C-alpha cells in the first residue's frame, strides 16, 4: 500500500512527490503523458524563481521528475479514471489496474479549451496546434495565426515570431487581456500583426488546414484567409479547462475546480488537491508548487502523528 498516491505529474504533483518521497513516504505518481504538465508547453518561465533564460518549461519539468525519482518516487504511466474513499483506504483506478493507498493528492491540472468551430477537430495536428513549443519549428518560415488575446496567446505569439514565423494574432476584442509588458512586446515586434475584433469561425482544408474563415464583429464582415506559398499554422489559446470530470460526485467542485482547506485537503478526508484544479484566484507554476508542498507536508505530518 502506498502512503501517497499523486494523480498528475505537473509542477504541483512533482513538488509533492519530491517532498513526500524525501520524507520517506512510499510515493507514486500517475502521469500518462509528459512530465511537467502544461508547464512543459511553455517556452519560457521568466517569472519562475531561479529559472535561466534558456530554461524551457519542458526542461524544468524533466528536472523536477528526475529529482522526485532520486528520492524514490515511482511513476506509473496510466490514466486515472476514478478515485474512491473506503474509510482509511483510498483506491485509485486506472484503465488497466487498481491501486490502494492511505492518501491521495489530485493534481491533474488543466487542458486547452477548444473553440468548437467547424474544421477544428479535423485539422488538429494537421495545421492546428495548442502547443507552440511542440510544433512551432514546423512553421518557422511560415504564416502563423494565433487565436486569443491572453497571456498564453501573446507569449506563444512572441515565441513563434522569434523563430522567424510571420505571426498574426486574431483577437475578438479591441485590446489584449495579456499583461501589459507582454502586450507591448508583441505590438512592437516586427514579425507580429494583430487582427482586432476578429473571430475564427471555420478552418478550411482537405488533408491539411489551408484557410480560415474570419468574422469582424465591429464591421460585421466575414472574410477568408487562404494559405500562400509558405507553411500555414493555426495555434489556439482560448483558456483552459480543469481536468476533474472523474471527480464529479466524489469531491465538492465549483465550475470544475476543487474546494480545499488551508492544508489543500478537499471535503473528503484524506483526498487533497493542488495546482490548476484548485478553486482560487491565481494559477501560476509557483503557487502550484507551493500547494503541492503543503499537501505533501500535511500528509507526512498525519502519517507521523496518527498512522
Task: Locate predicted features.
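Phosphate-coordination loops involved in phosphoryl transfer and adenosine-cofactor binding
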Residues: 1-3, 77, 140-142, 197, ...
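Beta1-alpha1 glycine-rich phosphate/pyrophosphate-binding loop at the start
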Residues: 2-71, 154-179
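Conserved phosphate-binding and hydrolysis motifs of nucleotide-dependent enzymes
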Residues: 8-13, 109, 148-150, 275
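Glycine/small-residue-rich loop that forms an oxyanion/phosphate-binding "nest" at active or ligand-binding sites
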Residues: 75-138
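FAD-site-proximal beta/loop scaffold in flavoenzymes
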Residues: 116, 122-140, 236-287, 291, ...
